[in-house]
């Protein structure tokens, strides 16, 4: 409706000196002309420019209809065909295919002639198909991409397929063949069709103190989001709906209302679907196509290791807190380090270590820390006037051992953020659904097993790394600081995609760092 109103107002705001904008409507009302004749005449003057089409769009339309000898795509004798009616419905729901509504040209008013509707439908279909294959955000510059159209020849070729498949199906076939993209595209479409696209943000403060029953605020929110039917409600169905909702939002499906569940309930389905559109857009522009690589999706809390184009291992991870966010990066894993030293980042030294030392100097010995000057000379902490310090002027190094914050193994790759993938003494955190607890590094579950798999596949042709999985086991047993350099450096991609899917399910993970929010503001022209 917003699109229709905008366009309707546009017609009245056109300046009188812009020609005769009403002529296109006079032309389209002429019953003495065939659709083909009307289309031919439309392109002979500036009828379309006068109602908001730019020259590129007009030239594109001319080319499209020239290929078709001015035969309409969606109309016959000025009446929508079945294909036309179904396609019009498809274009009313671009978010079902992962394309934000703002990417479409303002649609003609429903009362306008079907032939004019067709012209708008062609442009919007061309825009959608271009975005589905090329993306709508430039993630390097963090700017919206300009609206573009697929080539007229490719457009007509695709439109010919509408005799055998629907426009919905045609849109779903666009984009990369990547399995993750295919699963997300299909499951987003299914979610869109199954759940009402509510725009309501619920204020569910203190809802965790209310009983879970049919009259609760929870049940009203669940009905609005399509997880409950208003008829035949029962307390059991409310609980079952809550568990399904939690599962779809990357939370533990335990029926317990905690902070993360409340945050997910407060978010509207409309916003979740918009986040899914951004996730699809990121996948379609991804450059991950190597034979061997590691990818880490921060909001999903998972590490994926691939070798020989096959998924070898999936490991749960812990990522950085909101105040110590894990960065997105691309690098190459060069070595595996057993029993690593940990050089504590300067920010942690200042914010955490220095106050703890001032409180009790035994903090250093209890945590196996040593202090060094810039020339690597060790400092006796008992001879430092800690109370007088406002900054931490030394290097703080934690000695290797199972007590070490990096655990017994780390995977090293060059980056400007001083982050790694590593083990952790805090194994219990892997059992949580939302796992943002670190200082920015990525803590990995079962990292030794991951290291052994990497070494098992570390070869150039038939020449394998002389250090084997058994070698790593021996190093761990010896509890000595040792390094294994990889024969083949492994590309690693750390990225941020909040919405994911497998074959059967879509999951809307929390936008823990509000990075999707930044792109949503950009799409709605609210970016600073």
Please identify what each model-predicted range represents.
Residues 18-156:
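Cationic-aromatic interfacial patches
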Residues 98-99, 107-110, 131, 135-139, ...:
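Short loop/turn hinge sites at secondary-structure boundaries
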Residues 14-16:
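C-terminal motif of bacterial Sec signal peptides marking the signal peptidase cleavage site
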Residues 10-11, 434:
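Residue-level signal for mature regions of secreted extracellular proteins and peptides
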Residues 18-53, 146, 172-252, 259-528:
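Well-ordered beta-sheet/strand-loop patches within structured domains
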Residues 2-9:
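Sec-dependent signal peptide recognition
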Residues 136, 152-171, 241:
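A sensor for short, sequence-defined functional sites
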